[in-house]
């Protein structure tokens, strides 16, 4: 008696076996591209303010695009400020002015931690970042702690990593945003019930 043909059962429509990762022709898996975002910082601040509250992925995308937009506005305003004063760099003390111009009126009054001052024994931020991906200032310009290197020829502001870190250290602003987002979410949830 001939044996019946054995077929593998077809995967169900919604099963995970049917969905496979995209592969190249030679059989290697594609690497996932890395995307930088502020989502981990927003999440940390949210958990510090409201430990029992979570955030949706779409809301995190909104917060991420908001922070990118604010950061670009501050960089552009800092570039204009340096151009008006005929300077190639701005110090950490002068970086509060662009923040006051770009942010809402209530933000500059909230307490903001000052940038740490560099002692002679600690290296400058451009010297302390090892690796090929580290950005450093041109050798003709002195490195500034929490400063901003702005090319005079263009209005594009190239911020050093110390400015980015000091921007992320302003947790009072992020806490304010996280609490506003939580209040909006609570109000939105109560409307639809």
Curated annotation (Swiss-Prot):
Modified residues (N6-glutaryllysine): 17, 35, 44, 47
Pfam families given in the database record: Histone
Annotated SUPFAM superfamilies: Histone-fold (SSF47113)
Residue numbers of N6-lactoyllysine PTMs: 6, 12, 16-17, 21, 24, 44, 86
N6-butyryllysine PTM sites in chain numbering: 6, 21
Subcellular location, record wording: Nucleus; Chromosome
Post-translational modification N6-(beta-hydroxybutyryl)lysine, affected residues: 6, 12, 17, 21, 35, 86
Modified-residue entries (N6-methyllysine), positions: 47
Segments of skewed composition (Low complexity): 1-12
Modified residue annotations for N6-succinyllysine: 35
Residues with N6-acetyllysine modification: 6, 12-13, 16-17, 21, 24, 86
Residues annotated with Dimethylated arginine modification: 80
Positions of post-translational N6,N6-dimethyllysine modification: 58
Function field: Core component of nucleosome. Nucleosomes wrap and compact DNA into chromatin, limiting DNA accessibility to the cellular machineries which require DNA as a template. Histones thereby play a central role in transcription regulation, DNA repair, DNA replication and chromosomal stability. DNA accessibility is regulated via a complex set of post-translational modifications of histones, also called histone code, and nucleosome remodeling.
PANTHER family documented for this protein: HISTONE H2B
Protein's name in the database: Putative histone H2B type 2-C
Organism: Homo sapiens
Lineage: Eukaryota, Metazoa, Chordata, Craniata, Vertebrata
